[in-house]
UniProtKB/Swiss-Prot annotation:
UniProt xrefs under PANTHER family: MITOGEN-ACTIVATED PROTEIN KINASE (PTHR24055)
Protein keywords: ATP-binding, Kinase, Nucleotide-binding, Phosphoprotein, Serine/threonine-protein kinase, Transferase
Species in which this protein is naturally found: Pneumocystis carinii
Protein name per its UniProtKB record: Mitogen-activated protein kinase 1
UniProt activity-regulation remark: Activated by threonine and tyrosine phosphorylation. Activated by oxidative stress.
Binding site for ATP: 27-35, 52
Active-site residues, Swiss-Prot/TrEMBL: 149 (proton acceptor)
Chain ranges of the Protein kinase domain: 21-314
Gene field: MKP1
Pfam families reported in the protein's UniProt record: Pkinase
Superkingdom: Eukaryota
Lineage: Eukaryota, Fungi, Dikarya, Ascomycota, Taphrinomycotina
GO MF terms held by the record: ATP binding; ATP-dependent protein binding; MAP kinase activity; protein serine kinase activity
């Protein structure tokens, strides 16, 4: 190991950290890799970070693009208060690497763990959380980006109730083709419980509204302290949505691409919409009205971020001067790249560029020059 790095073991994974950093503890493990908390012993104040080790980046092109997408979007959204901050990135050996370290803002918990806990949550908490999600989402959408994986575990929270959106690996651009729809979108999107019906039913087009559906699912989960549409499979997920929202009308069914999906829905008994006041009898009526606007089956009728921020439920927080838009559209041109080697070089270039911008410059030679 070179003199600029130290080795630690975190949850069975070797962590090779930049000198000066010490691991505090492991925070989580998933298909992407491992996350730990660490501290910079060379700095006295504000010295704790979360370090995400993304592993097996180049085992599949999809994973390589996901890593590139994540680091590019974290840089693009770096200055927003409701989006997690990227402090540094590191590649231990650019000449032969299959992993990447992201040094990010350390938060104390995620919304999923808070919902599952015994901690009392009030309507004021719900208002604050939903407002902050929408502020971050407005900024993301204004850059022509769909997050596509909003869920409680991707919402980081501190004890002071500050909330930040994380995990942009599944995000995609909005290439407008027809009306509000998108020209390009992959199937790999959003954990099923938070997935918009137009995604599940392969509507002829879909839009920013898919993220607003996820926000509605999160609001309902806050109100009930459990997932709202907890489908065990694809069909069960749809059926749970129909039981609450009622059976879709013919106008909505006609927007579905799949003939078999259309036939399935037409074969179902006609179900009425269930009033949210019966499901959440003690909830703030304004919260239920916003929920109704978010969990609207037809995406063209679903509320937008800007409209949701102006909803009476969030009036105590709403301040247009503190709800900025992104000054620059995000460029998804790299999505067209098919070569893993080209993606590898792009990751090296992004890490080197970022270090130059943030004062953490290290020399990253092009693989072609090593």
């Amino acid at each position: 190991m070179d003199s600029k790095h130290s080795v630690f073991n975190v949850m069975g994974q070797e962590f090779v950290l930049q000198k000066g950093y010490e691991v505090i503890k492991g925070l989580g493990k998933g298909s992407y890799g491992v996350v730990c908390s660490a501290k910079n012993i060379e700095v006295e104040d504000n010295n704790k970070v979360a370090i995400k080790k993304i592993t097996n980046i180049f085992s599949k092109k999809m994973l390589a693009k996901r890593a590139l997408r994540e680091i590019m979007l974290l840089q693009h959204f770096r200055n927003h208060k409701n989006i997690t901050t990227l402090y540094d990135m590191d590649i231990v050996d650019p000449s032969k690497f299959n992993e990447l370290y992201l040094y990010e803002e350390l938060m104390q918990a995620n919304l999923n763990s808070i919902i599952r806990s015994d901690q009392p949550l009030t309507d004021a908490h719900f208002q604050s959380f939903i407002y902050q999600i929408l502020c971050g989402l407005k900024y993301i959408h204004s850059a022509n980006v769909l997050h596509r994986d909003l869920k409680p575990s991707n919402l980081l929270i501190n004890a002071d109730c500050k909330l930040k959106i994380c995990d942009f690996g599944l995000s995609r651009g909005i290439s407008v083709n027809q009306g509000q729809g998108t020209e390009y979108m992959t199937e790999y999107v959003t954990t099923r419980w938070y997935r918009a019906p137009e995604v599940m039913l392969s509507f002829q087009s879909y839009s920013k509204a898919i993220d607003l559906w996820s926000v509605g699912c999160i609001l309902a989960e806050l109100l009930g302290r459990k997932p709202f549409f907890k489908g065990s499979n694809y069909v069960d997920q749809l059926n749970q949505i129909f039981c609450i929202l009622g059976t879709p009308n013919e106008n909505i069914i006609s927007k579905i691409k799949s003939a078999s999906a259309q036939s399935y829905i037409r074969s179902l008994p006609t179900l009425p919409k269930m009033p949210y006041s019966k499901i959440f009898p003690y909830a703030n009526p304004d919260a239920l009205d916003l929920l109704n606007c978010l969990l609207t089956f037809d995406p063209y009728d679903r509320i937008s971020c800007e409209e949701a921020l102006e909803h009476p439920y969030l009036i105590i927080w709403h301040d247009p001067n503190k709800e900025p838009v992104c000054s620059e559209q995000f460029d998804f041109g790299f999505e067209a790249i098919d070569s893993i080697e080209e993606i590898r070089q792009m990751i090296i270039n992004e890490v080197s560029r970022f270090k130059g911008l943030t004062g953490n410059q290290k020399l990253y030679h092009s693989i072609s020059n090593t």
